[in-house]
């Protein structure tokens, strides 16, 4: 079993509240718009991190992280990218990719809008953790944590932080 902390859109921001949850996880997944290498260096000094770059990320971050990640955690296939849209309105090329690779979880960021939804059409769990950084229009900063136990996704929780 693995405890996962999922975050996105840090835009260079790291704070003690976020790091408290990093410490409680086994792995941290970042869905892009990291902002600075300090973010990933701080997290990876404590826990393994899987990340994709986002549209605001500089050349250095784009060299360090891919635009999309396809990986397996326990017995679950995951597809993560920064700009993904949402069920019923996926970004260009995403629907085709999902149909091709058939992930059990699809993760994206970009919108700063927290959304967790089962996509019945593609039979996957869609997760956008919202934004944990301070830049943007969002009024509440959010992260998502959950556990993966073999082929089960459980104990999903939204963590809200005041701006």
PLM regions and their residue ranges:
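Conserved beta-sheet core of the metallophosphoesterase superfamily
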Residues: 50, 89-152
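Beta-strand-turn-beta hairpins that frame and shape the catalytic cleft
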Residues: 1-5, 70-79, 119-125, 148-157
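N-terminal active-site segment of His-dependent metallophosphoesterases
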Residues: 1-49, 57-67, 73-77, 139-142
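Active-site-proximal segments of metal-dependent phosphoesterases and phosphodiesterases across multiple
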Residues: 57-101, 134
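Active-site environment of divalent metal-dependent phosphoester hydrolases
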Residues: 12-16, 34-39, 56-62, 85-90, ...
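Redox-cofactor binding/interface segments in oxidoreductases and associated redox assembly factors
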Residues: 29-30, 81, 108
